[in-house]
Amino acid sequence: GREIDYMRISITDRCNLRCKYCMPDGIQCMPRWEILSLEELEAIAVCAADLGIRKIKVTGGEPLVRRDCPQLVRMLKNVPGIEKVTLTTNGVLLEQYLGELLNAGLDAVNISLDTLDPGLYETITGADALDKVLGIISRADRLPIPVKVNAVSIDFDNWKDGKERDKNGWRAMAALAEQYPVDVRFIEMMPIGYGKQFQGIDHRTLLLQLKEMYPDLETDHEVHGFGPAVYYKSQRFKGSIGLISAIHGKFCSSCNRVRLTAQGYLKTCLCYEDGVDLKQVLREEISRPEKESHFIWPEGLDVRDEGLQSRLRTVMEKTILKKPMAHCFETPGRITES
């Protein structure tokens, strides 16, 4: 069977960008009191480690809009059994928090970036911030932790905004692996959320085009992380190129992860809404008047309380054991995740 040893923890549903396929303008965010506190996240991490989780990825939204993100990284690094804590960010605030994150023990960072074209970047994200992101990537060889760049494989030429697009914009993204010691990973668009409205690029086609661009491209069997990417190397690379092909390279049989939403919902697959509300377990003893008064976060939570850990363990273990064997993205009618 699969060894589930990796948890993605979303610490906020807010973001400082408005990417059209993810969080476009007008999207409603949850009230802050609905989001898990640091202590609640720590309690879940302690239990997750007891259940075999060894690696944690901190995500959002944009995790760095939450100013206590470095503090959380430090807390997670101190949880017995947790071996690696990494971060996925859009990179806009990374320069501001990088020192704190490194001091907290962050092991690696993934930067989400879909284009190197300033105009297209602003069209996608609603922000003029590309230079900030590229500033961090350009220093990758001087950073003490590995840097990966995540690009969603979108057919921007099909965007219905009346502008002509560079059909080969992915080439500039791929070339980052020539310029810097970074892993550039192309991620197939999944038909969920706002992503359903956009046309993705088939990774079978993308791989053929990459091989034309780099005739000596070959599979790189070196371990680059904990995820499902298939990596490729070339003599021209300082880094590597990875393909995460959820649709045309289904990797469910080796999927090793579960996901915790910012509201405390533990999910086992992006394709299905099934899961369990851990926030309900964490806050079950808080009175209804307190809940309705929109308190910020419960105070004085003992994250290692045996009773709390026992209740969390029971529901988390049951949920993880029911992780689906495979997604159903190829049959959209069966998808239950909105």
What are these regions (language model features)?
Residues R2-L38, D50-L51:
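Canonical Radical SAM [4Fe-4S] cluster-binding loop centered on the CxxxCxxC motif
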Residues R2-Y6, A172, E178-Q179, M189-S338:
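Auxiliary Fe-S-binding modules of radical SAM enzymes
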Residues Y6, S10, K57, T88, ...:
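Conserved beta-strand segments that form the floor/walls of ligand-binding pockets within enzyme
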Residues L17, P118-G119, K250, V276:
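Glycine-centered loop/turn positions within well-structured domains
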Residues R18, C22, R66, G119, ...:
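Residues that scaffold the ATP/ADP-binding catalytic core of kinase and kinase-like folds
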Residues I27-P31, D117-I124, G193-Q197, D277-L278:
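A short acidic, helix-capping loop that chelates divalent metal ions and anchors anionic groups
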